[in-house]
């Protein structure tokens, strides 16, 4: 721990391992745990796929098949074009699993990652990538780029320009107003997507840290109360991390369906 006071403890647990200064500041811990989460997802699915059989499937194969069918159903309900359905389906599955694994890191006791890092001479370490706005905003920017891509793919460059200049008021005189309204709506999608995930995961991480502070109290009462509170919040947080992964995936699919489906607008 970086200090001896409660404020020092909280500050230490909420400080990233960084390199660089200013705009070029990079959160190394966020990058590391994001990559580890992605590798775990790929390794797990590769192992299941390589051992898949046409006979009686194992428990993990059943789990993966159910997950794939569920995500495929979500995509089919939203994407009308079969030519991109598999692409967006693969993206949706990746988003859900990747975000879920990154969220699930929050269930590791808050003192374990920093204390292990201290053994390696690393003074600061935050293990939950989705509690970092730079990570969630980075994913949302990728979704934003895909929204632009699929809008142009579906409607053409001319249709893309018309969509953001002649809607909702179909007259050339309202082009500036239309563009402003549509630009705000378009930019709000990735921003809200990023801050929704970040806000929920940051709050969850902070609550775990505050509960851990109770174990440091001199009085026995908060120390005892910290145990059931920790357990209750951890159980509830399982729902939160799953729900947030689903919401991020679902909104991505919905945004891309609006961008691609010609019937919209």
Swiss-Prot record:
CDD domains on file: ATP-synt_Fo_a_6
Topological type in the membrane: Multi-pass membrane protein
MF term (GO), any: proton-transporting ATP synthase activity, rotational mechanism
Any one GO cellular component localisation term in the record: proton-transporting ATP synthase complex
PROSITE patterns assigned: ATPASE_A
One of the GO BP terms on file: proton motive force-driven plasma membrane ATP synthesis
Entry superkingdom: Bacteria
Entry keywords, A to Z: ATP synthesis, Cell inner membrane, Cell membrane, CF(0), Hydrogen ion transport, Ion transport, Membrane, Transmembrane, Transmembrane helix, Transport
Transmembrane segments: 26-46, 88-108, 132-152, 168-188, 195-217, 231-251
Compartment(s): Cell inner membrane
PANTHER family: ATP SYNTHASE SUBUNIT A, CHLOROPLASTIC
Xref: NCBIfam families: ATP_synt_6_or_A (TIGR01131), PRK05815.1-1 (NF004477)
Function per UniProt: Key component of the proton channel; it plays a direct role in the translocation of protons across the membrane.
Subunit structure: F-type ATPases have 2 components, CF(1) - the catalytic core - and CF(0) - the membrane proton channel. CF(1) has five subunits: alpha(3), beta(3), gamma(1), delta(1), epsilon(1). CF(0) has three main subunits: a(1), b(2) and c(9-12). The alpha and beta chains form an alternating ring which encloses part of the gamma chain. CF(1) is attached to CF(0) by a central stalk formed by the gamma and epsilon chains, while a peripheral stalk is formed by the delta and b chains.
Protein family: Belongs to the ATPase A chain family.
Protein name per its UniProtKB record: ATP synthase subunit a
Organism whose genome encodes this protein: Histophilus somni (strain 2336) (Haemophilus somnus)
Gene: atpB
